[in-house]
Every structure is written in structure tokens, then in C-alpha cells.
Amino acid sequence: LYADKIAKDFGFSKDYELVPFKGVYLEYKGNDQFIKRNIYPVPDIRFPFLGVHFTVRVDGKIKIGPTAMPAFWRENYEGFNSFNFKELLETIKWNTLMFIKKSEFRRLAIEEMRKYSKSYLIEQAKMLVYNIPSADLFRWSKPGIRAQLIDKRSLTLIQDFVVEGDEYSVHILNAVSPAFTASFPFARYVVEKYIAKNFYKKEVKDGEV
């Protein structure tokens, strides 16, 4: 959540800013497992979010979500816990600029605000699975915060990996989906391009990290 701040201390992330987005899920509290696998929609390629989908946890619990609502500060998990006035002003600034100047972001923000409604979120989920149990059997679960990088020059959401560094430090500013699936080749890329080149001043042979 603070990768850009740390990078700025080293002279990087000059063109980027991190804007937090809150992801909230609805968790199914019923006893029957009405689905057994994760189910995803076709993503909207204009945005770096997967949309409302079904997740089956390792314990069998079913979740619907997440939302992608702008958070008010970087650790805005619940209420006013970890409130940060400076971050609030920064977040309002960038969200307002994108809302005014970028019609696609404006549509995204309006759509995501509607997902504060449990019934609306479930209606979105019904596009994937029609026979969903009653909304009364779903409860809001703990939220997560997505560290979304934006380009300050173009006011766009960055949808690719962003790495900056030199011989003194390496900064992963944006690690997007599929970050977990791509973790090994991505780690190889970072080691070969930054660590091996700048720290050890030698080439890494193909197939070695």
C-alpha cells in the first residue's frame, strides 16, 4: 500500500501515484454448498478489476464479490480506524480528477457505488449463477484494499507490472493479476533486469535465478 511512497524516497515513482480501492465480499452463511468451483465473468478490458465473481475458500465457504470502490485512505478497512487526513486529501484529489476528466472512470465509480447495496451485488452475481439462495443468507465479510497505481500524466489506471530501480534499490510499484500465477517468471525478470545487472554486475544464465 505504500510502495510508491517508499519509491519516492529513492527518487522513483515520479509519474505514478497509488490510489486505494476497497474490495468487499458477501459471504454465504447457509449450510448447502450451491457451487463447488470458482466462477469468473469475462473481464472488462478497460479496467484492471475482474468484476463480481464467486470464490470457494479452502474451508468450503462461498464468497461473492469483490467490489472495487475507491477507499478514502490507504488503510481504510473499517470505519475511521487508521484514519489519515493527508491520505484522504490525496485520494480525493486523484479520484476527483479522474472522475471529472475520464468518462470511463466515471462510469466505473458510479457502478461500483451501487454495489454498496447487497441486493444489487447479488443481482450482478446472478448473471453467472441464476439459482442463488436468498440474500438473507449472505453477510458482509472483512474488506481488502487493492493498491492500484495510476499514471499522473494521463490519469489512467495502470494495468501492467511496473518496476523501477537502480544499483541501490528495486521497487515493484504495480503487481497486477495474474501476479500469483506469474510469480516465478516475474521474479526471474526482476532478478535478471535489476538485481543481477545492478547489484552483482553479471549476467544470469538462461534458466537460472
Regions found by a protein language model. Name each.
Residues L1-A3, L121, F186:
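Mid-domain beta-loop-alpha active-site segment that forms a flexible
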Residues L1-F83:
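Flavin-dependent oxidoreductases
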Residues A7-F10, P185-K201:
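Internal hydrophobic alpha-helix adjacent to the cofactor/substrate pocket in enzyme cavities
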Residues D15-G23, E27-N31, F99-S177:
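Flavin (FAD/FMN) cofactor-binding core of flavoprotein oxidoreductases
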Residues H53, E75, V170-E192:
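A conserved FAD-binding loop/helix module that cradles the flavin
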Residues D59-W73, G79-Y130:
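Residue-level recognition of phosphate/Mg2+-coordinating polar/acidic sites
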